[in-house]
């Protein structure tokens, strides 16, 4: 029989949200268990293949104001938190460069009009800078003479996704987080089989928690679905970009994020598909051809990885935190394509809810974060408390 250990919080899922939450909660003094169905490298998570761009203004062209605001708050948190980690993580705030070929000039007008419609006016005025061809070359010498115009979105940034995942886990473990790897499919009520009894369960499983996010009554859209994202990693020592670059195109808009050691992450927008099979030849050609059109030296790059991952997405494309006060379960989901951009602010709010539950607050869903992010935190009732507590061993 498995010996049972008691914890304040059991976190299901060790992707980006789970690791951020574990690190925050253990530093607050909580006893934390982190349970993951796979291994510690995080290779099965959407965060593992992400470009990890921190670009709230650029994303405002395709996202809602809530994402922009969460992103602004999260970049501040990343700056502070990464400085506190004992392991260095690549992080920069040198801006985003947006370019387009002459025949696609109309895409620039659409891009800027969407930004101005969604982003805070002060953010646009502070960060948006129009460039002529000379200015593009001054910002990115590797692109000198290649584009007659561009936009610099100052202050935007990026980080090393895999370095962040490693550092967060290492720090959390050193602070005392108890980890269970290769746990398979685990629910809140099966934790005792792993030797875990927890006062509060924080569910950060992404698509692994699909059953807990059903469709709305009478609705046909799934409460949580996966949207396919495709990313190529290449080694391109002859390119020499210094910041993320977005290439506007009516059919194949791409982003290219330079990482340390001449690595580049090349990706595009998501596909409306639950398919997680390997990348198609067509997709690979589109991404790599677009990169080659940005800089011909990508033609000599070495392809290291062709990655596919599904991003957990709610019908409104916004993140949500659901709080079952009776069952003492908090669920975080729906970070969609904005994981690294918004995860710090979202998990900070979720950890505030968990902290309120641990303190016995009868209205844990109404923490100050609920006022800051209206509608993101929702009180729900999933199951009778006594039944769930009996299953998890909380009543003894």
Language-model features: locations:
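Helix-loop-beta segment of a Rossmann-like dinucleotide-binding subdomain
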Residues: 87-101, 124-174, 269-273, 330-333
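Conserved Rossmann-like nucleotide-cofactor binding loop
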Residues: 17, 40, 208
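Active-site substrate-recognition segment that forms the wall
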Residues: 23-27, 37, 48, 53-54, ...
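C-terminal catalytic lobe of FAD-dependent flavoproteins
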Residues: 301-396
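Short beta-strand to alpha-helix junction loop
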Residues: 62, 66-72, 103-107, 151-167, ...
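Helical element adjacent to the flavin cofactor pocket in flavoenzyme catalytic cores
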Residues: 147-198, 204, 208-211
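N-terminal Rossmann-like FAD-binding beta1-loop-alpha1 element of flavoenzymes
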Residues: 7-33
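Dinucleotide-binding Rossmann-like beta1-alpha1 core, especially the glycine-rich loop
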Residues: 51-139
